[in-house]
Amino acid sequence: MGGPPYGETLKNYLNYSMSLNAERIHSPVLMEYDSMEALDAMEYYEALQHYGVPVDFYVYPNDGHVTERPEHRFMSMQRNLDWFEFWLLGRENDPSSKSDQYTRWRQLKALAEKKDSVERSPSAGNLTR
């Protein structure tokens, strides 16, 4: 961001920080981090949750910034495919073997749909989006 989050560079944080701009996100977000970076990402995760954005968070223990362990890379690729199929196509890939994953995602979807219906209701006034 070009410097610390105060002084002359504060505006960069206000403009580009994912956490400080979470209210602008309306699409489901899949977050995948290694154990060393996961703590730094929690602020963004919590901000998305606060604004009712469907978000799921996975941590790959003992891995690097770029998923290096083959089993983690495979899991990440599969999870990303599942995520896109679920949110974009409405499909569940082998739901019996991934019941926890899909149960969680269905709950996220139901919460998002409930939030959308409240925001669009006549009593809510103008659309918030």
Give the residues covered by each predicted segment.
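Active-site-proximal cap/loop segments of hydrolase catalytic domains
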Residues: M1-R129
